[in-house]
Regions:
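Non-transmembrane, aqueous-exposed alpha-helical and coiled segments at domain scale
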Residues: 1-131
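Single conserved hydrophobic/aromatic residue that forms the stacking wall/gate
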Residues: 131-143
Length: 143
């Protein structure tokens, strides 16, 4: 069986919570697009976990999790998130987390360009997060 959770409200509609609830019955959980500008908190018997890049299935033993081709991955953030999960007793290994070779990697200069754009706007922000991946995401048509 295939279950898809698709947001149509530009975020903040509870997709992460639904994935957490439904992932109990899944062998594979795929996050197909986005970056660490999104996030949700999961509280379970292992503790409280804040997820930005990781699919919610990472909290389930025996579940394979995939960061898909539409993902924008900030490696520094991903490594930090993985380490926090490991400290909480969650297994983050090559067996539990797969990364598409078509995912986009956020480089330090992308963040710098995003900060420079904010400066150019002279404080007139237009709703982006402080993760500084907007510049990179604007360069690609992610599908």
């Amino acid at each position: 069986m295939l279950t898809a959770i698709v947001g149509v409200n530009w975020g903040d509609e509870g997709k992460g919570r639904m994935v957490d609830l439904l992932s109990e019955r899944c062998d594979i959980v795929v996050r197909y697009q986005g970056g660490n500008n999104a996030g949700h908190t999961v509280v379970n018997d292992k503790g409280k976990f804040i997820l930005n890049l990781m699919p919610s299935g990472i909290l389930r033993d025996g579940t394979v999790n995939v960061l898909g081709p539409g993902m924008v991955i900030d490696l520094e953030h991903l490594c930090g998130e993985a380490e926090r999960l490991r400290q909480g007793g969650i297994s983050v290994t090559p067996e539990t987390l797969k990364i598409s070779d078509k995912a986009t990697i956020c480089m330090p200069y992308h963040k710098l360009l995003d900060c420079l754009e904010e400066d150019r706007l002279a404080g007139k922000k237009f709703g982006r997060s402080e993760e500084h991946t907007s510049e990179l995401q604007s360069q690609f048509h992610l599908v």
